[in-house]
C-alpha cells in the first residue's frame, strides 16, 4: 500500500471489533474526555514510542475530529513504512454518534 485508504465508520468499527489498531490524533483533552476503547493517543511526543513498538504489517486506523487531519497522519504513517493505514471518514464525531456505546473516557 503506497497510499492510505479512507474507510467508513462502519468499516472501521468492524475492523476495530476484529482487533484492529486505532490511533487517535486529537488533542489530549478531547482524547481524555472520550475515545475509542483501546485506541492509542498518537501525538508528536508519543509517535516514536508507537513506531518503535509497532507491527508494521498490522493494519492501523487513524481517527481525528472529522476525518480531515487523519488523512495527513495516515499518509505520514505510510511514509514511515506501515503496510496498511486507513483514515476513518467522519472522525470521532461520527464514531461517537454512530457507536456511543463504544466510546470511553480516560480513567
Swiss-Prot record:
Active site: 64 (cysteine persulfide intermediate)
Key word Cytoplasm present: yes
GO BP annotations, alphabetical order: glycerol metabolic process
Keyword annotations of the record: Cytoplasm, Transferase
Sample GO molecular function, one term: thiosulfate-cyanide sulfurtransferase activity
SMART domains for this protein: RHOD
Localisation per UniProt entry: Cytoplasm
A single GO cellular-component term on record: cytoplasm
Annotated PROSITE patterns: RHODANESE_1, RHODANESE_3
Domain Rhodanese: residue ranges: 16-104
EC id: 2.8.1.1
InterPro entries in the record: GlpE_sulfurtransferase, Rhodanese-like_dom, Rhodanese-like_dom_sf, Thiosulf_sulfurTrfase, Thiosulphate_STrfase_CS
Function of the protein: Transferase that catalyzes the transfer of sulfur from thiosulfate to thiophilic acceptors such as cyanide or dithiols. May function in a CysM-independent thiosulfate assimilation pathway by catalyzing the conversion of thiosulfate to sulfite, which can then be used for L-cysteine biosynthesis.
Protein family per UniProt: Belongs to the GlpE family.
Protein's name according to its UniProt entry: Thiosulfate sulfurtransferase GlpE
Organism (species): Pectobacterium carotovorum subsp. carotovorum (strain PC1)
Highest classification ranks of the organism: Bacteria, Pseudomonadati, Pseudomonadota, Gammaproteobacteria, Enterobacterales
Gene name of the encoded protein: glpE
Amino acid at each position: 500500500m503506497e497510499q492510505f485508504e479512507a474507510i467508513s465508520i462502519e468499516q472501521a468499527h468492524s475492523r476495530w471489533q476484529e482487533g484492529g489498531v486505532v490511533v487517535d490524533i486529537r488533542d489530549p483533552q478531547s482524547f481524555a474526555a472520550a475515545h475509542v476503547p483501546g485506541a492509542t493517543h498518537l501525538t508528536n511526543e508519543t509517535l516514536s514510542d508507537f513506531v518503535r513498538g509497532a507491527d508494521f504489517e498490522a493494519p492501523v486506523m487513524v481517527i481525528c475530529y472529522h476525518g480531515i487531519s487523519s488523512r495527513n497522519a495516515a499518509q505520514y504513517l505510510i511514509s514511515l513504512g506501515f503496510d496498511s493505514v486507513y483514515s476513518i471518514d467522519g472522525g470521532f464525531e461520527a464514531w461517537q454518534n454512530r457507536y456511543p456505546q463504544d466510546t470511553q473516557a480516560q480513567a
